[in-house]
Amino acid sequence: MFFTKVLNNQVANGLKQLPVHKRVQMAYDLHIPNKTVNPNLNIRSHEPIVFVHGIFGSKKNYRHDCQKIANVTHTPVYTIDLRNHGQSMHALPFDYETLAQDVTDFCEDHGLKKVNLIGYSLGAKICMLTMLQNPDLVRSGVIIDNSPIEQPHIEIFLTQFIKSMLHVLNSTKIRADDKDWKSKANQAMRRYIPNGGIRDYLLANLINKVPKGYKSPVINYDDGYIHFQNPVRHMTEVAVKNVSAWPTEHVKGLKFEGQVRFLKGTKSAFIDEKGLEAIKEYFPNYSLSELNATHFILNERPQEYVKLICDFIKVNRYKSLQEHIRHVENFSSAELEARHNAEHERQMEELRQLTQTTPTAEQVKTIDNLASKVDLSATERQQQQNKEITV
């Protein structure tokens, strides 16, 4: 097993072993639609958005973009920290099967259904694998500049990322109390990464104090030096070989029939002809938009990619509503009324019972869920009467 070899190499290099956990608790932020956008907005959503970052990224990288997406689409957006990133646990394995299962576990733990997945780079592959292996969990996907194939040609770039970060940690020995710690780290990384935008992306993980919340068991935050939030010394192999991989054998014959929008940088090689053929095979209902950018689309074309995502989510929601109404219209008026009346009354009676006394935290969740169902029931009846949709 590859990660067993990784653990042995960590010991050989004098490093404390990275723990092995099948499941991890992932840190996340929830971006709620701003009430000023629509004061009457009911934020309960059966189709929330989950945003998955790239290698050495975190949930904080695109928090402003995700808030815009939440506001424009009137949809809650969950941004997560993958294992070994941000404020989430540091642990092996670090492969696509494990990372996709982490996303699935997160959705199930938080009661998220029919999610819209948005993934960038590493996160894009994780989202694609999640869609293929758990299609009932996902409504749609936005895949930002990646394709479902092995990509050995990107290993040279991943290696440079690792070298630059290790150079900051091992060679420069920058003190945490140095007032110029970040600029010195930036200068040190130039040796391996001339692109200032990429350096800024990696430096967003650099800290000069003990982090709040999760504290890695393999990083000594009290040694007086700066540190990356990622366990960089422990990721020299997995961040290169595993990130460039794709579990072809595990997804053979699988397809995701939902709508998937791919965003491609015209100056990027992450979606080539081979990648496009694989996209067609796995995702028959895909569409492709190109932006004048390198692989770092989110930094170079922030307004364009946010608009493309919002338009896609809104159009897809309209199609979802159309499907729902076509389903409802298959019932006769009498059948529909009987169905609604019985279910509506049962839900209302349960709500009455729960709200007679001060509810517990668990009962609050039940009340919220029931209220959402009652709202939907009323909406269905109105739709049957009006025979029209307002989006």
Curated annotation (Swiss-Prot):
Pfam family, one: Abhydrolase_1
Transferase keyword on record: yes
Keywords for the protein's UniProt record, in alphabetical order: Coiled coil, Hydrolase, Mitochondrion, Transferase, Transit peptide
GO cellular component, one term: mitochondrion
Boundaries of the annotated transit peptide in chain numbering: 1-24
EC number(s) per entry: 2.3.1.268, 3.1.2.1, 3.1.1.-
Activity regulation summary: By ethanol. Thioesterase and esterase reactions are highly repressed in the presence of high ethanol concentrations.
Main location: mitochondrion
Domain AB hydrolase-1: 48-154
Reactions it catalyzes: ethanol + acetyl-CoA = ethyl acetate + CoA; acetyl-CoA + H2O = acetate + CoA + H(+); ethyl acetate + H2O = ethanol + acetate + H(+)
InterPro entries according to UniProt: AB_hydrolase_1 (IPR000073), AB_hydrolase_fold (IPR029058)
Protein origin, superkingdom: Eukaryota
Applied value in biotechnology: In contrast to S.cerevisiae, W.anomalous is a better ethyl acetate producing yeast. Ethyl acetate is an important industrial compound, used as a chemical solvent applied in the synthesis of biodiesels, paints, adhesives, herbicides and resins. It is also popular because it is relatively non-toxic and fully biodegradable. However, the sustainability of the ethyl acetate industry is severely hampered by the current energy intensive production processes that are based exclusively on petrochemical resources.
Subcellular localization: Mitochondrion
Positions annotated as active site in the UniProt record: S121, D145, H295
Role, per record: Alcohol acetyltransferase that catalyzes the synthesis of ethyl acetate from ethanol and acetyl-CoA. Can also function as a thioesterase by hydrolyzing acetyl-CoA in the absence of ethanol, as well as esterase hydrolyzing ethyl acetate.
Family assignment from sequence similarity: Belongs to the AB hydrolase superfamily.
PANTHER family listed in its UniProt record: PROTEIN ABHD11
Protein name, as recorded: Ethanol acetyltransferase 1
Species: Wickerhamomyces anomalus (strain ATCC 58044 / CBS 1984 / NCYC 433 / NRRL Y-366-8) (Yeast)
